[in-house]
Amino acid sequence: ADRELHRSKA
């Protein structure tokens, strides 16, 4: 889940 990682970085 790459999108999950990006959301966590936000």
UniProtKB/Swiss-Prot annotation:
<dbReference type="GO" id="GO:0005576">
    <property type="term" value="C:extracellular region"/>
</dbReference>
<keyword id="KW-0134">Cell wall</keyword>
<keyword id="KW-0964">Secreted</keyword>
<protein>
    <recommendedName>
        <fullName>36 kDa cell wall protein</fullName>
    </recommendedName>
</protein>
